[in-house]
């Protein structure tokens, strides 16, 4: 959409499982993604919204799970997902100091959405993830407002940009400009095609550790740029969406394997890195309505999950690579230049 090329255009092919039609998380039917990039008055931040299913998420409540590798983060809403195994709002990503403001906007959005369906809500669990974009964005000014969140939600569609957009506008990954990235994988089972996709907000890692398809690309870049005080800190938000029928317990198993994709790009999950995974399946729902009825869901056979694990790992690895390759060079708040990966990869 912005004319940039994905990591495959540079000759790198992540894994062996086929990708979806657009190689995006929105290859999963019903999933939509929207951005609002905030660039007024020197700000370089924003909001990215992931809508997990068609219709009212609060009413439908897709099965969901969460997993944290290193908990240096301020993500909102994960406690209830852990307890109940469902998600009841879209997932919004932003910067660290705007979690509260985005959460408030997401509550208001959900109230209005439910009012349109003649539902009066008393409790809402807004889900908001974050990374710290203060190297590039004046984060203390907390520039994100309600209308930015609503714009991201209302603009959500199957086609969306990657790189320096939305919540990825000000992120730094492995000493290079990070951003939003996505990828997907498909499998055929019992006569049906299923899709799993990943979306990341990359803001982690040391330049020297960056790996692309097993190649020490970051080390080669570091020999050219000579980074100072390189640390494995920052964060990454990883969203996994699928239409594979899974239970919340199975989803957590998938999220744990998604971490393989993060490690393969060079993360050592340092002290200051928040590594948070949120997953959902829009094949299974546990709605609150119909309290006098038993609820049932379908589940993938446990002994057939190996391929699903690999789908998650490959999707995350490629999504991180795409977040870097779609990004463009940026100047930080202290004047430092953050180069982009595409500067160092021959086409």
Can you annotate each of these PLM segments?
Residues 1-347:
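Alpha/propeptide regions of enzymes that mature by internal proteolysis
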């Amino acid at each position: 959409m912005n004319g940039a090329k994905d990591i495959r255009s540079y000759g790198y092919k992540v894994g062996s499982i086929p990708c979806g039609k657009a190689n995006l998380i929105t290859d999963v039917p019903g999933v939509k993604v929207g951005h609002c990039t905030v660039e007024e008055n020197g700000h370089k931040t924003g909001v990215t919204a992931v809508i997990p299913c068609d219709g009212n998420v609060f009413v439908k409540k897709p099965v969901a799970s969460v997993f944290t590798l290193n908990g240096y983060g301020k993500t909102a809403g994960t406690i209830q997902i852990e307890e109940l195994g469902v998600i009841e709002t879209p997932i919004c990503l932003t910067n660290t100091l705007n979690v509260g403001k985005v959460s408030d906007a997401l509550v208001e959005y959900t109230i209005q959405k439910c009012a349109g369906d003649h539902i009066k809500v008393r409790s809402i669990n807004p889900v908001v993830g974050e990374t710290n974009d203060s190297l590039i964005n004046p984060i203390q000014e907390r520039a994100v407002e309600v209308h930015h969140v609503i714009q991201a939600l209302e603009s959500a569609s199957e086609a969306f940009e990657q790189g320096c957009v939305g919540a990825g506008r000000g992120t730094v990954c492995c000493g290079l400009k990070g951003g939003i990235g996505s990828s997907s994988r498909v499998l055929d089972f019992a006569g049906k095609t299923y899709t799993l996709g990943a979306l990341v907000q990359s803001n982690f890692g040391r330049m020297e550790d960056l790996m692309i398809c097993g190649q020490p690309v970051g080390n080669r870049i570091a020999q050219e740029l000579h980074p100072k005080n390189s640390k494995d800190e920052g964060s990454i938000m990883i969203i996994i969406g699928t239409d594979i029928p899974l239970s919340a317990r199975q989803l957590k198993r998938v999220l744990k394997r998604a971490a393989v994709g993060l490690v393969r790009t060079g993360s050592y999950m340092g002290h200051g890195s928040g590594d948070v995974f949120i997953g959902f399946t829009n094949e299974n729902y546990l709605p609150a309505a119909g309290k006098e009825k038993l609820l049932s869901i379908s589940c993938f056979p446990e002994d057939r999950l190996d391929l699903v694990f690999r789908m998650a790992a490959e999707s995350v690895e490629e999504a991180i690579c795409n977040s870097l390759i779609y990004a463009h060079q940026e100047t930080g708040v202290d004047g430092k230049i953050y180069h982009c990966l595409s500067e160092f990869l021959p086409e």
